[in-house]
Structures are given as C-alpha cells and as structure tokens.
C-alpha cells in the first residue's frame, strides 16, 4: 500500500494524481482480496464459506485484460460473478475488484488529509462519540439557539462524480466509479433511483463514499462559518485589517442607534459551535433570532448550490434552547437557569452576590421509550409488561442475556442524564416481561418459573445495585448519584431503541411541515 501512496505522490507532482494505471496492477487486487477475506472472516465463520468462493488470480488477470479491451465488462463491479455456481451478491471477484477501486480512490484523499490536518488548529476535529457530551456540557449553556440539521443522504450519482472531479483531475480514473454508481442506481433493489450514501452496508466502498461526502459538506460549511464569524455586514468576506473592522463597526453602531437598537446586536461576532453524530448535526449559536434564520437560510442555500440538492425545510430546524428541547442524539436536550448563591469577602466586609448560571440538562425520554417497548412487544400501549413470544424458542440463558443487554444499554446511555428515576420503571417492565417470556416458554406461571429456576437468575441480570458496582462511589456519594452525571465509556454501542425513536421524531417533524 505504501508503494501506491508513493506512486500517487509522484503523479501528484506531475499530472495531478493520475490514478488510472493503478487499476491494472495485479498487486492491487491481491491487497483488496486480503481485505475482503479479513472483513468476511470477522463477520461470518469459515465453515460458511463454500468451495465455490475460491479466488483465482488468473481469472483476475483475464478480467483486467477484458477491461483493457473495453468490452463493457466493468459491470462486474456490482452484480456479476465469473463463477456461475457462486452467488452474485457474495462473489469474491466483484468484492475484490470493488475493494481495489476503493483503494485507488483513497490514495489522493490520504495524501490530502495529511496536509489538511496541519491547518485544523482553529477547528478542532473530534472523531469519537465521547467528545459529543463534553461539547454539549461546555457549549450548550453558553448558547441560546440551536439548529438541528440532517445531512441529505440521497444524492444523484453524477453529483458524486463531479465532487470527486474537484480533487482528481484524472478523468479516466473516474469512469469505473461512474459505472459502479450507475449500476447500483439502476439495480432492481434500489427503488429510489438515487445513491444512498449512508453506510447501511458495512463495506469499504460505501464507508468511503460516506466519509468523502461528509468531508465535502463540512469542509465548505466550516469555511463559511469561519468567514461569517468575522463580520455580519459583508457576507463571507473577512476584513484584511482588524483596525478597519473596528472602525466600520463603530460607524454602523452610531448609524443604527438612530433607527433601532436591535440592529446593534447583529454586528457582534456570533459564537457558532458545530458537532455531528452520524447523519445528524447540531449547530449551537449565541446570537439573535435573525442571525439564526440567516444561518438556516445559508445552510439550505449551500446544499442547493453546492450539491444541487433540494433540501426540505424540515431538515434544518431552529429553536430557542430556553423554551424548547432538542431531540438529538436520543435525548431531550435543554438548557435551564440554575441560580447559584456565592459569598465573597473583601476588606473585612461581606458581599453577597447571586449568580445565575446556565446548566445543560439532558432528559431521559421515558414516554418515547415506553412507546418503543410497546412497539417491540415488550409491553402493551398502557405500559403493562407482556411476554416476548418471538424469543420463546431460545434458551433460558439467551433470554436473560438479551433482556439484560437491553437494560444495560439503556442505563449506560442515559447515565449522564438528570432524573433517572423513570429508568427504573423501564427496568420493572423488562424484568417482568422476561419472567413472562420464560413462563410462556415453559408453559407455566411466573411463580412456578421462579421456584424451578430460582430467583438468583433474575438477580443476576436485574440486581438492584448492579449499576453502581463499577462506579467509585462511597456510601455517602451513592446518595448523591441522582445529582451527578457520569458518562460511561461503552455508550458507542447505541441500542436500536434510540435510533428507532429518532426516526419517529423525524416523521413527526415531516408531518408538521406537510400540513
């Protein structure tokens, strides 16, 4: 792989990343085949791999020769298999060639990212979900407006190719990418006739498309936000000298006082903070309502002009934090006023001052979680636990482990929220639903199941003090656990209930705009 990077660097100095000859290198497909085997071995056992999936580099050489002859055999990237006995969708040939295409396209972006990271001191880029919660606690209390924006994930394949063309000047190297995208677009499984760039399938190709697409969206957006933070009077044009900037602001303030006092606040530098998780992004702004409306307008206009996408208005929602709650990522997020009483002593005199601070307050969405539990057949609409009939064919340990995993995911994910008392209602529903599922499996009652299996099985999974076993709490500190927030380190394993609840919230917002 280092040789490909060196080859890309040499071509970058001569012909702006001339990558087309890399497609005919046999070593490239050997590397991609190893990556394909590593990915398949981690997802499925070796005994599931049939003998028909044997890989032959002689066949790859023949395919390379056919590509050189340009007899339209490029369609093998998606749905063609040289071995008729092998499954078309799981063919190692198509996957390996697709991996090779991804490796070639990653060469210029890896070189570009090496030099772009050096200039990212002003905009700190975090790549972990753990950075979201410090961001919310640090930036949300100092913001008064929030914009919840969703990245459009359905895009025309030709737009993706044009965005690649801005970096890769080698036009022939983009022909295989265009063929793959159009082949996927015209496949019978794709009913929307567009490219879904969200990596629903964990393949290297779709992950690369998603990362590149998000990078293009955020890189241009960051430059607009940086320019807009210098001045609101000149759109996206920073002042060359700071002295002229202060003089112009002073002149505008004197002029605006004759008309309206509210226009003075439009000239102050706004504080704009940005965070993204998945396809949802949050822009926290400290400014006026007119500034938030302009940011929302610029964001919609940016997507339409840069990516030629019509972005629905409900994809960018703006509201005030002190009056409304946001619903991302899986929380009810709000900022509340917290009066703080501080006493200071100076010169033997006691001065008492009341300080009012803003406090970030994530709320556990108990009612939506109950609705999702009813949707997944753990309880009815009123919250009464019922048996999970689809799990009755599992063993007792599997049933207990599944219920236990759901509870641990819920508790750990909402461990940093205030008012976690409602979670114990969820715990009661899950424990009783687990007991009813075991009773339904053994065709007995809950009392008989407890006598036969013993209460220790339930205590193993639903113990009262289990959630505090791993926390460094003393006996006195345990009483203050409801007022303290601890974000667990295993929250990246987000439970599917949170994602399902977020989809329901999106549908509600869409219905409001459709009316």
Swiss-Prot record:
InterPro entries: Domain_X, Maturase_MatK, Maturase_MatK_N. GO terms for biological process: mRNA processing; RNA splicing; tRNA processing. Keywords: Chloroplast, mRNA processing, Plastid, RNA-binding, tRNA processing. GO terms for molecular function: RNA binding. It is found in: Plastid, Chloroplast. One of its GO terms (cellular component) is chloroplast. It comes from the Eukaryota. It holds the Pfam family Intron_maturas2. Signal peptide: none annotated. Belongs to the intron maturase 2 family. MatK subfamily. Usually encoded in the trnK tRNA gene intron. Probably assists in splicing its own and other chloroplast group II introns. This is Maturase K. The gene is matK.
């Amino acid at each position: 792989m280092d040789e490909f990077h060196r080859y890309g660097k040499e071509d970058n100095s001569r012909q702006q990343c001339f990558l087309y000859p890399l497609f005919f290198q046999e070593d490239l497909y050997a590397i991609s085949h190893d990556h394909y085997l590593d990915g398949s071995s981690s997802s499925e056992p070796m005994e599931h791999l049939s003998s028909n999936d044997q890989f032959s580099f002689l066949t790859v050489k023949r395919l390379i020769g056919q590509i050189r002859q340009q007899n339209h055999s490029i369609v093998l990237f998606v749905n063609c298999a040289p071995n008729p006995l092998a499954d078309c969708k799981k063919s190692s040939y198509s996957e390996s060639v697709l991996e090779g295409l991804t490796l070639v396209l990653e060469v210029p972006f890896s070189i570009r990212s090496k030099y772009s990271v050096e200039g990212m001191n002003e905009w700190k880029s975090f790549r972990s979900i753990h950075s979201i919660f410090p961001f919310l606690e640090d930036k949300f209390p100092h913001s008064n407006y929030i914009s919840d924006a969703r990245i459009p994930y359905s895009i025309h394949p030709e737009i993706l190719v044009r965005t690649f063309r801005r970096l890769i000047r080698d036009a022939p190297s983009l022909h295989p990418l265009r063929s793959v995208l159009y082949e996927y677009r015209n496949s019978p499984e794709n009913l929307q006739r567009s490219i879904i760039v969200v990596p629903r399938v964990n393949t290297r190709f779709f992950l690369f498309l998603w990362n590149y697409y998000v990078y293009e969206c955020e890189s241009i957006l960051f430059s607009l936000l940086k320019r807009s933070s210098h001045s609101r009077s000149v759109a996206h044009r920073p002042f060359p000298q700071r002295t002229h900037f202060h003089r112009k602001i002073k002149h505008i303030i004197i002029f605006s006082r004759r008309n309206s006092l509210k226009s003075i606040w439009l000239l102050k530098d706004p504080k704009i903070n940005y965070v993204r998780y998945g396809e949802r992004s949050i822009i926290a702004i400290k400014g006026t309502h007119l500034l938030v409306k302009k940011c929302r307008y610029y964001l919609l206009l940016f997507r339409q002009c840069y990516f030629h996408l019509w972005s629905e208005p409900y994809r960018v929602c703006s509201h005030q934090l002190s009056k409304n709650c946001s619903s991302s990522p899986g929380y009810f997020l709000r900022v509340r006023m917290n009066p703080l009483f501080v006493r200071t002593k100076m010169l033997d005199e006691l001065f008492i001052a009341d300080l009012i601070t803003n406090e970030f307050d994530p709320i556990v969405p108990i009612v939506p979680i109950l609705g999702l539990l009813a949707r997944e057949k753990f309880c009815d609409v009123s919250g009464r636990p019922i048996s999970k009939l689809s799990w009755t064919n599992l063993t007792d340990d599997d049933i207990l482990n599944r219920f236990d995993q759901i509870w641990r995911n819920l508790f750990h994910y909402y461990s940093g929220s205030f008012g976690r008392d409602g979670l114990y209602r969820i715990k009661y529903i899950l424990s009783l639903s687990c007991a009813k599922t075991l009773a339904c499996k053994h065709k007995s009652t809950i009392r008989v199941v407890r006598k036969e299996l013993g209460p220790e099985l339930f205590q193993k999974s639903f113990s009262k003090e289990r959630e505090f076993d791993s926390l460094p709490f003393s006996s006195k500190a345990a009483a203050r656990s409801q007022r303290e927030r601890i974000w667990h380190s295993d929250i990246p394993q987000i439970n599917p209930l949170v994602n399902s609840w977020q989809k329901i919230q999106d549908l509600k917002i869409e219905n409001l705009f459709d009316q």
